[in-house]
Amino acid sequence: MVTRDVTIKNSVGLHARPATFFIQKSNSFKSSIWVEREDRRVNAKSLLGVLSLGIVKGMEITLVADGPDEEAAIDALAELIDNELDDLK
């Protein structure tokens, strides 16, 4: 199991369009992947789950992956959050 804390930097957070791209990226991996915020954990492959966290700019979330490609999954999702979501407003 691999975990990584990331801070949301894009202006709109993880909702609507950015969340859709996050879910698509999550679904490209075989590992089970979760997003944690405070005391809640949701499936990173579930749009409704991710949207229910109400993730906005400046929030810190934890990415958790467990499976055969867990390292690659965490690296790719952290990269997406850190560098690619601002273009998806």
Locate the predicted segments by residue.
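Compact, glycine-rich, soluble single-domain proteins
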Residues: 7-48, 52-57
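C-terminal structural segments of small proteins and small subunits
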Residues: 56-89
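Intrinsic-disorder/low-complexity, polar/charged segments enriched in Ser/Thr/Lys/Arg/Asp/Glu/Gln
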Residues: 1-5, 60
